């Protein structure tokens, strides 16, 4: 989509060139989704639309699903941090890195240490005042920030799996040991040096991620979203004869006599 000056960000154009993109359309919003889904006199309709957008884009993607494929319905950004014994300054900074996205961005802190939680809260208040998007962060933190005090790691990750966050930071000693406890999260960041903005820009995995709890049943965008496959079956006569009667039993149990008949006529061969 173009900026307020009507131009496409040159950094996006450069990235598209490096990626080998052949066509670029300077359009955004719900109207851009409609254009791609249904086509125009100058634009051919596409098979699939992917990527995040505002609430209007999200609703437009929902409406055109079925005419085209989509990746997901993305909502406001969210980050969840499970931490104990970490630097509260670092944790606060990571939480604010998502709060600055949107007044409705959600930030969660899960910890077994109440004093640590208070230090993180104080750090967030201090750091917000020094950053340029203060009003956005303030709205996010006031309305959508939650802290959970847990008795142990198992309870921490039980809460994580209920939230199913878009981004999950695990800043505990030996963080890899907790991976088997994590079932629902879009992207998982392990260790104190794996700050969430690394995933936004440089880490490698695609950062279009399921939000609003949909990580419980959805995965990040990946190359598999741009491919599809077909199943292929082939029986010879011997294989058919071994299984024909069983197929007929299933078909008749469902009352689908034409299915059974398609098997029976071959039994006579």
Ranges and model annotations:
Residues 4-19:
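Active-site-proximal loop->helix
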Residues 4-8, 27-35, 175:
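Short acidic loop-to-helix transition motifs that present clustered carboxylates
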Residues 15-106:
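Conserved NAD(P)+-binding/catalytic subdomain of aldehyde/semialdehyde dehydrogenases
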Residues 22-25, 46-50, 54-55, 71, ...:
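Structural motif
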Residues 72-143, 147:
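A conserved active-site cap/scaffold subdomain adjacent to cofactor or substrate pockets
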Residues 88, 114, 152-155, 175-176, ...:
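Residues at or immediately preceding the N-termini of alpha-helices
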Residues 128-169, 173-174:
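Glycine-rich, Lys/Arg-enriched anion-binding loops that position phosphate/diphosphate groups
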Residues 161-269:
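C-terminal core of ALDH-fold dehydrogenases
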């Amino acid at each position: 989509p173009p900026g307020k000056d009507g131009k496409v960000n040159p950094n996006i154009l450069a990235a598209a060139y490096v990626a080998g993109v052949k066509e670029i359309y300077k359009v955004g919003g719900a109207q851009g989704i409609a254009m791609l889904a249904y086509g125009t006199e100058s634009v051919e309709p596409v098979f699939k639309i992917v990527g995040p957008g505002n609430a209007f884009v999200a609703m437009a993607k929902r409406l055109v699903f079925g005419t085209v494929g989509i990746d997901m319905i993305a909502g406001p950004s969210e980050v969840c941090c499970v931490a104990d014994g970490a630097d509260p300054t670092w944790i606060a900074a990571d939480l604010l890195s998502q709060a600055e996205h949107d007044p409705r961005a959600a930030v969660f802190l899960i910890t077994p240490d109440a004093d640590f939680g208070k230090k993180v809260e104080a750090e967030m208040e201090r750091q917000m005042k020094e950053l340029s998007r203060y009003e956005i962060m303030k709205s996010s933190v006031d309305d959508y920030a939650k802290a959970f005090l847990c008795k142990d790691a198992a309870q921490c990750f039980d809460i994580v799996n209920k939230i199913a966050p878009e981004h999950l930071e695990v800043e505990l000693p030996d963080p890899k040991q907790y991976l088997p406890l994590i079932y629902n999260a879009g992207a998982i960041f392990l260790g104190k040096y794996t700050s969430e903005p690394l995933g936004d820009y440089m880490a490698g995995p695609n950062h279009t991620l399921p939000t609003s709890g949909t990580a419980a049943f959805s995965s990040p965008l990946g190359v598999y979203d741009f491919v599809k496959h077909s199943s292929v079956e082939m029986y010879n006569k011997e294989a058919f004869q071994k299984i024909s009667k069983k197929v007929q039993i299933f078909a008749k149990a469902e009352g689908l006599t034409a299915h059974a008949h398609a098997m029976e006529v071959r039994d006579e061969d």
